[in-house]
Every structure is written in C-alpha cells, then in structure tokens.
A protein has these predicted regions:
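Short, Lys/Arg-enriched, disordered terminal segments
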Residues: 1-15, 583-587, 591, 645
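Intrinsically disordered, low-complexity N-terminal extensions of nucleic-acid-metabolism proteins
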Residues: 1-3, 9, 120, 253, ...
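Helicase motor core with emphasis on the C-terminal RecA-like subdomain
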Residues: 3-21, 25-29, 33-55, 61-65, ...
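Gly/serine-rich nucleotide phosphate-binding loop at the start of the catalytic core
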Residues: 70-71
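A broadly structural signal marking compact, well-ordered functional cores
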Residues: 95, 227, 231, 245, ...
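C-terminal accessory region of SF2 helicases/translocases
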Residues: 287, 305, 313-322, 328-638
Length: 645
C-alpha cells in the first residue's frame, strides 16, 4: 500500500481531481476550506445552503484518500442519483437502503470489502444491523460523511433517531474523521450536531445563507387564485408552485392550463414514469410551471427558476428556506413568494394534532397493523412488509395523514421503520459474457440499439447491478419508454440480463418483535418535547408572514444565527418601509399650499417654474394648484400663475 500524501500534496491532488472528474478549475465558496479540513483528518461541520455544492466537499477528498468513504444519508432518491452520477464519471460507488433483500445487501457489502469501491451510500436505519457492523470492520474506511446532519439533533425540524447510531459507528472506527453537512441548522442544532457526532474539537465552516438575488415577498390576500394568476402573468420565467396536498396540485394545474399558462403537477403518489416525464418537460421548458407538494425539488438541477410560490404555509422556517432557495440558483434576479390569508393561521395550528395524534391513537394504529399483516404476538423481528396506506385506512376506517404521523412516531420510538413512498430505481445486470453479445444482433435493430445505448451509458453492467433510467434510454434510442421496458423484459426471459424494474414501494420493517399495544412506550423526548418544538417552529413561521416591520432576509438569517446589519432593500417589507419613509418626508398639503402662495406673492410663475422650487412631484403640484384655484386664492393668466388680488 502506498503512503498517504501529506496535507499540501492532498490540496494539490484535490484540485487535480476536481478538474479531472468535474471539469472545474476552482472550488466555490467554502468548498475548499471544508475539503482542506477533512483532508487533514479533522472532524468538520459544513453549513451550506441549498445549491451550495455539498457533494463536492466529500466526493473530492474521498477520491484523494486511500480507502472508501461511508456516506450516511436519509434521501434514498438522492443517494441513487449520486451513485449513478459517480458511475458515469468512472467512479465506483454502491448504495444500501431500506427495502433491499438480505442477499443484495450481503453482495453489496462483500463488494465494498474486496471490490476497490470509493463510496458506500447507506441509509441511517441500516447502520444498526449486525451484518453491516460485522462487514464494516473488514472495510478500509477513509472518512465518514453525514448528509442532512441536522437529523441527528432533537432540536432540528427533522430529527431521526437512527442518526444517533452514528456515534456507535464512530466508536468502531475511532481514527476515521467525520464530515457533517447540512443546509439548515439553527445555532442550537449546530452545537448539538458536533456533540452527538463526538467531534474531537469544534470545527464549523459556514457559507452565508444570504441570497442577494432572491427577493422574499409575502402577499396578504383573501383570493390566492387571483393573486397567483396575477404574479405568473406579471413575472416571466420558470416557476414552482408549492401546495399542501395532492388534490390541490391537480386543481391548480388545471386552472393554470385553462388560463394558457403551461403547467404540470407532481406529488409522491404518481407512478415513476409520469414523474420522470413531467420533470423532464418542466426542466426542458416545455412546461413553465410545476405545481407540487414538498415531494418535489430535492436534487433537482434547474438553476433558472425565476419564482417559487407557496400557496400554503410550510410548517417551519427550515422547510420554507430550503424550498424558496430553489429559485435563482443561476445568480439572476428571482422571487420567493408566500400567499397568506388570515385563515392560514388556524389551518397551520390544526396541523399539530395531525402531526402528533394522541398516544392512544398511535397504539391503536400499531395494533391494527398487526391485524393487517396477521402477525402473531412475539413475531415480526426484522420482518419487511410492503405497506399500502390507502388500503390500510379503508379497512380500519382511518384518515391517512394522522396514520402516517403515527407510523413516524412509532419509528422514532424504535418499534418499527416506516419508509413512505420509496422509489426503487430500475437495475440491470448482464448474465452473459461481453464476448457473447454478437449473437444478440440477430434479435433485431431495436434490440441492438438498446444494448448499444446501455453499454455506452453505463459502466459495470457485466459485474454488478447497475441503476438505469428507461427514459434516458428511450431518448438515446428513439424508442418509447414502453418499448424499452418490453425489450428488457424479453432479455430477462431469455436469461441474457437480470432486470429489476422501478417500483414505488412504501415499506414497514419491524425492528422489534410484536408486543401488546398497551406496552408501547412513547417517551417525552419522542413525543412531548418534539411536539413543543414543532409548535415553536409553527409560531416562528407565523411570525415571519405576519411581520411588516423587519427585513425578511434579515429575519431569515437571524433565525439561522447569521447576523446582518443591512436590509436587503428588495423584500416587500423593505419596499413598504421605503414608501412610507418617502411619504413621511413630504410636507403636508396645508404647508405646501402656504408655500405656493408665498412664492407666487413674490413673483408670477408657470407651473413648470413653480415645480423647480418645490419638493413635490408633478401630480401633487397639480392637486395643490386645483385646490388653491377652487378656494379662489390663485388664478392663471395665459398660463402664468399669480395670486388673486
């Protein structure tokens, strides 16, 4: 094994890797500071807003180091996307996430030990399994990356108990440095992340959350639909409209299309092909507006979004800041608009019992879950079951939203693991040798085009299951997505490939055997404390939208612990305060009338000549002159103004 480069050599190597694999000549913002820190094996926390280039900060130093980077992230769709992007660059990467079979997990872990891979992406829930920890001891891990690291903090808006297991992984790898990354963290969360990840020394790098090109606007209106149409007609460019539920996505989309504003809708309940097609139409500009729930946006690469509009209030500043931040990533002028009605305050407070249903309700959901799966007392440990929430609610007369919340709380309490709306990306593995491909040419031109497109687009298809995108293959071959699917199924039947199609599958995984519902213990940390913090975040959101005296950009920055002494000058509050200031600077009308009379008593003037001597605009002067004329105090003779004798 070659010796590890020193810090200065690593810095040079990092720059060379950036150029070789990504084509960039230099790092952006604080990327280089973070990379230098982790390259020196220092535990590091990087605070970077959405679109700040987080992935570069761990992918570059990991390639410079010997061994493999362990990447812990809860975002399964993003995990798969990054693995695929790394493979396209010729970098070996694998992923383990909820829903994979035990055999697939074992094969993946064995490849990490013997296959010279550089990255293993893993969901936090998988860290606690015996098989992972056994195999981990045999791996050469160079660094640990914790993405969405705010999830480890109970002060955070998205606390996940599985993240607490990372500290145990650190004990197994005591000499391995950790890089924690997040786009949203308050000062309390920043401290908590470092403590819970057992940082040897406090070490934080912050990229400013200020967005000089993004204007934050709150429009108070009781007719949100009319205001939405007005905004989209007034402001050109690509847009995202966020709404709270799936039904509204369709309703708003139909409204916009009827008004000749091209729009599509997107939510987690759509099938994968529909999602991909609509996302492609929007990204290519074929559809101007994407109307979506918060399921849309993570990992979307579209820098020219000009406006993000929230028709409904998010339930935290953190969520709003992340969604609003998808506008204007190209650095050009953009807008983030919230439409706020008085009824929104009541609506937001009603989310509290939906998000934290009564404990007895949660126990009832747990018990009915056992009836649903016909699970005996004491059974269930490590059982994986697909879960159809609509079917479950229909059978047991529940509403989906509080059931979803109950399952999340049971996950937090450690009784099960619930992964909602999980997308399983298609995978393919050739089961014949490369030198046998020649015989497939006899199967027709379409088949030959498909195979050639697969070989050109993806590496490693003869040695490992590789994620593929049927829509991309359709574009490259000129075939339809349906034809691609049918051809791959045909190849699988002939045992030429092993093909695992995409599937949208929510899962419930039992992390403990079934117990009596009344024995379910939900601790204050999981329930009461989190509920109180949720209420605090809701109140912060309401303070933001009802505020009319403080610059909105400063208000957001202050929430995340960043001090800023100047106003943005472009939010609705700044514009309103500036208008009021200008109005207050103008003398009152009685004073202006007296001033006009004083000037005209000394000399007769035209209106234009008078305007040069007075601090007012033309419209106001016209109003003053009409008033003085009506009162009989001045007259105009051949266009010359004078005092009436």
């Amino acid at each position: 094994m070659s010796s590890q480069p020193d810090a200065s050599q690593l810095s040079t190597l990092n720059s060379r890797i950036l150029k070789q694999y990504w084509g960039y000549d230099r790092f952006r913002g604080i990327q280089e500071d973070i990379i230098d820190s982790i390259s020196k094996n220092k535990d590091t926390l990087g605070l970077m807003p959405t679109g700040g280039g987080k992935s570069i900060t761990f992918q570059v130093p990991a390639l410079a180091k010997e061994g493999m980077c362990l990447v812990i992230t809860p975002l399964i769709a993003l995990m798969k996307d990054q693995v695929q992007n790394l493979k396209k660059r010729g970098i070996k990467a694998l992923a383990i996430y909820s829903g994979m079979s035990r055999q697939d997990i074992i094969i993946t872990l064995e490849n990490c030990i013997f296959g010279n891979y550089k990255f293993l992406y893993i969901s936090p829930e998988r860290l606690d399994t015996e098989i992972f920890r056994t195999k981990l001891r045999k791996m050469h891990i160079s660094m640990i990356t914790v993405d969405e690291s705010h999830c480890i903090s109970q002060w955070g808006y998205d606390f996940r108990p599985a993240y607490l297991k990372i500290a145990e992984i650190r004990e197994l790898l005591p000499d391995v440095p950790v890089l924690a990354l997040t786009a949203t963290a308050t000062p309390e969360v920043v401290k908590d992340i470092q403590a819970r990840l057992h940082f040897r020394h406090k070490n934080v790098f912050r990229m400013s959350f200020e967005r000089n090109n993004l204007a934050y606007i709150v429009r108070k209106t009781e007719n949100k639909t009319a205001e939405l149409l007005h905004i989209l007609r007034s402001m050109p460019g690509s847009a995202i409209v966020y709404v709270r539920n799936r039904r509204r996505t369709k309703e708003i989309t139909e409204l916009l299309n009827n008004e000749y504003i091209t729009a599509d809708f997107y939510h987690a309940g759509l099938d994968d092909a529909t999602k991909d097609i609509r996302q492609h139409r929007w990204q290519s500009g074929e559809s101007r507006v994407m109307v979506a729930t918060n399921a849309f946006g993570m990992g979307i690469d579209k820098p020219d979004v000009r406006i993000v509009i929230h028709m409904d209030l998010p339930d935290s500043i953190e969520a709003y800041f992340q969604e609003a931040g998808r506008a204007g990533r190209d650095g050009q002028k953009a807008y983030a608009v919230i439409l706020y009605a008085k009824s929104d305050k009541t609506t937001l407070h009603k989310r509290i019992p939906d998000t934290f249903p009564e404990k007895e309700y949660i126990r009832d959901v747990y018990e009915h879950l056992q009836y649903y799966y016909q699970m005996a007392m004491g059974d269930g440990l490590d059982c994986v079951r697909e879960f159809n929430i609509e079917d479950f609610c229909r059978k047991f007369k529940y509403f989906p939203v509080p059931v979803d919340s109950a399952l999340r709380i049971l996950t937090q309490a450690g009784y099960l693991e619930y992964t909602a709306e999980q997308d399983s990306t298609s995978r393919i593995l050739f089961t014949i040798r490369r030198d046998e491909l020649y015989r497939l040419r006899e199967m027709g031109e379409d088949m030959d085009r498909l195979i050639q497109a697969v070989l050109r687009s993806y590496t490693g298809v003869f040695t490992d299951y590789t994620y593929i995108n049927e829509d991309s293959l359709a574009i490259r071959t000129g075939l339809t997505r349906r034809q691609i699917y049918e051809q791959l199924v045909h190849l699988a039947k002939l045992r030429i490939v092993s093909y695992i199609p995409r599937k949208k599958t929510p899962y419930i995984i039992y992390t403990r055997e079934r117990i009596e519902a009344q024995r379910i213990h939900i601790s204050p940390e999981v329930y009461e404390h989190r509920k109180a913090r949720y209420e605090t975040r809701i109140n912060a959101m309401l303070d933001y939208v009802t505020n009319d005296t403080v610059c909105r950009s400063r208000m957001l920055l202050d929430y995340f612990g960043e001090r800023n002494e100047h106003n943005c000058g472009q939010c609705d509050t700044c514009i309103s305060l500036r208008s009021k200031s200008k109005a207050s600077e103008q003398p009152d009308r009685e004073t202006l009338c007296a001033k006009v009379c004083e000037i005209l008593s000394c000399e007769s003037l035209t209106p234009a000549g008078l305007l040069k001597q007075l601090p007012m605009d033309k419209e106001l002067l016209t109003e003053i002159l009409h008033r003085l004329s009506d009162e009989g105090k001045i007259i105009a003779v051949d266009g010359i103004l004078q005092i009436k004798k």
